[in-house]
Design a protein with these regions (language model features):
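Amphipathic, small/basic residue-rich leader segments at the start of a protein or domain
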Residues: 2-110, 131-138
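Long, well-ordered alpha-helical segments
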Residues: 30-40, 94, 124-129, 167-173, ...
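N-terminal glycine-rich flavin-associated loop
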Residues: 108-127, 153
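Short, solvent-exposed loop/turn elements at beta->coil junctions and helix N-caps
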Residues: 82, 148-152, 177-178
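A structural signal for short hydrophobic beta-strand segments in well-ordered beta-sheet cores
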Residues: 161-164
Length: 216
C-alpha cells in the first residue's frame, strides 16, 4: 500500500500489539511524509488557530490538508476501518506527536476529532459511528461546540437550553454563545437540559444538524 508515494510496508501485517520496531518504523514514515508533503502557504495568511477561520479560502485549504493527512494514515490511525479509520492499534499518539513537531497547518476539524469522535467511539450506536466518523476524519463535515450560553457562560450546571421529547423527536429551544467554528460547521455537539429539576444529570448530548430549520 502506498501513501502519497511513500511505502508503508507495516500496514498490511501490523500486529495488534505493535513492537518497538513497528512503532519506530511508523514514526519514521510520519516524519518523511510530513517533510515531503508540507503544503505551500496560502495566498491569505492563516489565522493562528481554527477559532479564527472565516475565509472560504482558509476553510478549503485546511479541509484539503486534513483529508490528505487522513489518506496518509495520520488521522483515525487507530480507529477501525469500518468507521473510516486505519486500524493500527497504538499508533495515533505517534502520528499526533509528529504532526505537532512538524509545525504544519492545524487540523480544522479539531472539535470533531477531539470531542465528537472519542464520544461516538465509546457511547455511539453502530449506525452513528458508521455515519459520522468517516466525514469527521476527512473534514467533509466540520463540527462545532454548543455548550456555553448567554446567561450561564461555560457553567453547564446553569445551562438553560431545553430539550423536550415529542414522540420520536426532540424539540430544542435556547441560545448558545462562543460557538467555536459555528459559521463553517455542518454539525454541532449540543448540550440541552431535558430535566430542569436535576441540574447535574438532567442534560442530554445531541448531535445537531446545523442546516436544520430553526437554527440561526
Amino acid at each position: 500500500m502506498a501513501a502519497y508515494g511513500l511505502k508503508l510496508p507495516l500496514v498490511e501485517n501490523m500486529s495488534e500489539q505493535s513492537s518497538q520496531s513497528e512503532r519506530d518504523e511508523f514514526r519514521e514514515y510520519c516524519q518523511r511524509w510530513l517533510d515531503e508533503n508540507r503544503p505551500p502557504p496560502t495566498n491569505v495568511p492563516l489565522p493562528q488557530n481554527a477559532y479564527e477561520v472565516t475565509y472560504h479560502e482558509h476553510r478549503t485549504y485546511l479541509c484539503d490538508w486534513q483529508a490528505k493527512c487522513h489518506e496518509a494514515q495520520l488521522i483515525g490511525t487507530d480507529v477501525a476501518k469500518e468507521y473510516g479509520g486505519h486500524g493500527h492499534t497504538e499508533f495515533q499518539a505517534i502520528a499526533s506527536a509528529e504532526v505537532r513537531k512538524a509545525r504544519v497547518p492545524y487540523f480544522i476539524n479539531w472539535i470533531g476529532l477531539g470531542m465528537t469522535a472519542p464520544t461516538l467511539l465509546v457511547h455511539g450506536t453502530e449506525e452513528q459511528k458508521r455515519r459520522f466518523l468517516p466525514p469527521i476524519f476527512t473534514a467533509e463535515e466540520i463540527w462545532c461546540q454548543g455548550f456555553s450560553e448567554p446567561g450561564a457562560g461555560s457553567d453547564l450546571v446553569s445551562l438553560q437550553t431545553s430539550a423536550v421529547k415529542d414522540g420520536d423527536n426532540w424539540i430544542i429551544n435556547g441560545s448558545k454563545v462562543w460557538t467555536s467554528l459555528g459559521a463553517i460547521s455542518s454539525w454541532m455537539l449540543l448540550l440541552a437540559r431535558n430535566d430542569k429539576d436535576d441540574k447535574y444529570n438532567g442534560i442530554t448530548y445531541f448531535l445537531a444538524d446545523m442546516a436544520h430549520e430553526g437554527v440561526t
